[in-house]
């Protein structure tokens, strides 16, 4: 998880000690909520890539699944126009992943096709989506941001229909 500190980092919320304690660690670093990986490192520099948000992680039987990792791969599938992975409640595993896909017009995707594609990209079996919902479009706000809470409701209705 990315933590930052410096002159350009804000010093906290005005009159909100409780929230400030939650977003700053004991050394004064701001906890961003972003997950990252080091993509290149040498003696002088490090290069990082943000790979998602902590709050978006899917926890299946204690194993962590990054939706962004799977979305990045599935977005390269020729039959996928748009994709989002969200957690889905499960009585055995706690959460499982559900792939919400807008297929390219005229294309038909199945969970088997999706998971075969992910396996070709060396994705571990515990990360594979266990549900697939195909949609005409992903719910977005006026500026194009994915509405994940709305998407969870759509998925709940689709799966329980």
Regions found by a protein language model. Name each.
Residues 154-161:
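Acidic/polar alpha-helix N-cap and adjacent early helical turns
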Residues 1-4:
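A structural motif
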């Amino acid at each position: 998880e990315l933590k930052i500190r410096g002159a350009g980092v804000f010093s906290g919320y005005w009159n909100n000690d409780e929230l400030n304690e939650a977003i700053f660690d004991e050394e004064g670093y701001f906890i961003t909520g972003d997950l990252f990986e080091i993509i290149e490192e040498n003696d002088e520099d490090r290069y990082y890539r943000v790979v998602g948000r902590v709050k978006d992680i899917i926890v299946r039987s204690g194993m962590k699944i990054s939706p962004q990792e799977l979305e990045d791969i599935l977005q390269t599938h020729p039959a996928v126009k748009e994709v989002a992975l969200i957690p889905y409640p499960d009585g055995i595993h706690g959460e499982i992943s559900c792939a919400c896909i807008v297929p390219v017009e005229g294309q038909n995707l199945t969970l088997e096709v999706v998971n075969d594609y992910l396996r070709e990209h060396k994705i571990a079996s515990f990360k594979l989506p266990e549900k697939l919902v195909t949609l005409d479009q992903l719910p977005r706000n006026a500026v194009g941001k994915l509405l994940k809470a709305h998407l969870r409701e759509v998925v709940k209705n689709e799966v329980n229909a």
